[in-house]
């Protein structure tokens, strides 16, 4: 009996020790996870799943590790298992949807986004679920950007390319030529350093191309932004200055933005900035074209979500104002970062919260006439892909630049791509009245290509303006039409046009039809039986003619013709119709129409009936009414 008890105690002790060991592993994995050492943490979570110790928790954490390591294939694998768990936090629906889009399973991604929303999750307004045609629009959009690989990528992570005065600055985790490497636990790669090379260099990049001065440290450094005069650099770095590492209350070494000065071709005098705080990240500097504003991303409190984009004024003395969040048109519940502002003041940034093709995509802003940002637009393929696309930069020419991506086909982890941009081409113009030169609103614009295929069908705005996006190297025919006018058509071509040209102007002129009823939107001027006075409803119609003649066509000349029904004698009806014509004439004159612009006012009695009510058949009153009318004939328009 004692032996049996001894064996039982041993078994229980072994089970207890095993459980204690697994608990210790989970605690270690969580510690690594919280310190962003996702590679090592993922290995331990796998062990826990194999040992079936708190496997549901380890599965969720493992999916998170792969998501942070930007590995959507493996993230989707474990998130798929996670979302089948009972009482799973709904945030995992969203994470699973993001991972699915990263492996181009867009329909499934959309289903899980909907489930996330239906479960109470917040999906940014105007986003993926709201626009079912989003992906179709992205893939069918006209291509503006044409890519080429650069010769300075490595097998590691390279991004943040920034061109200045014939040199390219970029951040890289490569460390070729260095015997001792410091590795970053997030991805087990070396820490980032800033490199600078000649734009036209053909030689391999190594440690000798690291930027000269005090920019690089043993921690993350880069990317950078440089002022127009080339004398000041803003750059991202882990919180490390004067050999002091400044961690937050959780022991995390967050990023900050530092400023350096160029002295004798060396970047030095590195200084901390007032916008930094060790308790949160401040990173990804970008300068406005006039260098008076600094844009950056941060996960500081009070934002919209994970990380937001902010802007702060740079004062004359170099001090900084108070950061301002750019608001929910740009920032979402997801992550926004890597801002860049081109010469035109357009903000470009990376986001995984706006509708995209998967993971991070590059977006540009749309501003109104006052310069206020009113919307954002996905740059589409080939800049964006199902993987991470970010760190967009545009040269001053507005046509060339760089961005980074970890898409398939690259040399390493994140690769830098150069692009040539061929701007979209528009045809625009104003449709006007050929006589009074006034714009024609609501004119129908029909655009056909050289094969007669309809490319666009639209209406002009209140100012007679239209604008249509077109392809280059195509012949076109455009027609304007409106019920008050004769059509006008013109042919034009987009062939052999310089790529710097973005607009072709084709104005169209419409000739008014010689029909007062159409021009004035006129109803028929009716009279009561055996009467020639102007009824109130007739006065409203005559006022339209007054406006047309005095405001729209001050050179128009008309003739008035009045008619009766068939009841009464021929002689009586002739006189009655003349009286009606005279009443019409007198009303127009009384309202300001010059008498010289009415050549005659005549009565035709019952001679021009509009129907068969000639007295030989019985007709209802409303049919007789149709014959008691006044008409207007255009004699001249100028």
Give a label for each model feature.
Residues 527-562, 589-590, 632-638:
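Periplasmic peptidoglycan-binding/anchoring modules of Gram-negative envelope and division proteins
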Residues 351, 355-358, 550, 561-638:
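Periplasmic OmpA-like peptidoglycan-binding domain that tethers envelope proteins to the cell wall
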Residues 449-465:
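Short, acidic Ser/Thr/Gly-rich low-complexity loop/linker segments typical of extracellular
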Residues 92-95, 102, 106-108, 115-430, ...:
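Short, conserved micro-motifs composed of acidic
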């Amino acid at each position: 009996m004692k032996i049996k008890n001894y064996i039982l105690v041993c078994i229980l002790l072994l089970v207890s020790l095993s459980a204690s060991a697994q608990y210790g592993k989970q605690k270690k994995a969580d510690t690594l996870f919280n310190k962003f050492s996702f590679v090592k943490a993922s290995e331990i979570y796998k062990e826990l799943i194999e040992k079936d110790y708190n496997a549901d928790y380890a599965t969720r954490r493992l999916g998170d590790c792969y998501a942070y390591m930007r590995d959507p294939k493996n993230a989707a694998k474990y998130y798929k298992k996670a979302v089948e768990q009972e009482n799973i936090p709904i945030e995992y629906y969203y994470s699973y949807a993001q991972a699915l889009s990263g492996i181009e399973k867009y329909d499934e991604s959309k289903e899980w986004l909907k489930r996330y929303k239906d479960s109470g999750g917040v999906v940014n307004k105007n986003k993926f679920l709201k626009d079912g045609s989003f992906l179709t629009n992205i893939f069918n959009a006209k291509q503006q950007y044409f890519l080429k690989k650069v010769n300075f990528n490595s097998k590691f992570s390279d991004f943040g390319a920034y061109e200045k005065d014939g040199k390219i600055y970029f951040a890289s985790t490569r460390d070729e030529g260095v015997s001792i490497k410091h590795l970053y636990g997030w991805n087990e790669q070396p820490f980032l350093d800033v490199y600078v090379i000649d734009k036209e260099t053909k030689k391999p990049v190594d440690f000798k191309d690291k930027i000269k001065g005090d920019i690089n440290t043993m921690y993350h450094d880069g990317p950078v932004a440089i002022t127009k005069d080339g004398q000041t650099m803003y750059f991202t770095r882990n919180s490390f200055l004067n050999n002091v590492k400044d961690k937050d209350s959780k022991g995390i070494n967050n990023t900050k933005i530092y400023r350096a000065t160029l002295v004798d071709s060396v970047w030095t005098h590195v200084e901390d900035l007032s916008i930094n705080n060790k308790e949160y990240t401040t990173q990804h500097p970008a300068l406005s074209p006039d260098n008076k504003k600094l844009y950056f991303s941060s996960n500081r409190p009070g934002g919209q979500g994970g990380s937001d984009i902010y802007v702060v004024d740079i004062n004359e003395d170099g001090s900084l104002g108070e950061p301002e969040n750019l608001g929910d048109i740009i920032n979402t519940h997801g992550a926004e970062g890597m801002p860049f502002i081109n010469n035109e003041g357009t903000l470009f940034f990376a986001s995984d919260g706006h509708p995209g093709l998967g993971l991070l995509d590059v977006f540009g802003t749309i501003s109104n006439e006052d310069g206020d940002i009113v919307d954002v637009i996905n740059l589409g393929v080939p800049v964006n892909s199902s993987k991470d696309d970010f760190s967009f930069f545009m040269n001053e020419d507005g046509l060339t630049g760089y961005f980074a991506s970890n898409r398939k086909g690259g040399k390493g982890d994140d690769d830098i791509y150069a692009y040539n941009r061929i701007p979209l081409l528009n045809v625009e113009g104003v449709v006007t009245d050929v006589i009074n030169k006034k714009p024609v609103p609501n004119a129908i614009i029909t655009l056909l290509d050289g094969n007669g295929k309809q490319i666009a069908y639209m209406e002009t705005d209140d100012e007679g303006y239209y604008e249509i996006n077109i392809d280059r190297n195509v012949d076109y025919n455009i027609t304007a039409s409106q019920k008050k006018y004769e059509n006008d058509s013109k042919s034009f071509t987009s062939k052999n046009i310089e790529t710097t040209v973005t607009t072709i102007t084709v104005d169209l002129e419409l000739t008014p039809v010689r029909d007062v009823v159409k021009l004035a939107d006129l109803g028929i001027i009716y009279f009561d039986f055996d009467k020639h006075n102007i009824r109130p409803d007739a006065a409203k119609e005559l006022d339209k003619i007054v406006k047309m003649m005095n405001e729209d066509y001050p050179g128009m000349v008309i003739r008035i013709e009045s008619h009766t029904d068939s009841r009464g004698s021929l002689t009586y009806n002739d006189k009655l119709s003349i009286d009606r014509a005279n009443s019409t004439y007198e009303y127009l004159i009384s309202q300001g129409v010059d008498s010289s612009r009415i050549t005659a006012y005549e009565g035709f009695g019952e001679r021009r009936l509009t129907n068969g009510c000639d007295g030989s058949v019985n007709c209802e009153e409303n049919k007789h009414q149709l014959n008691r009318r006044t008409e207007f004939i255009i004699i001249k328009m100028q």
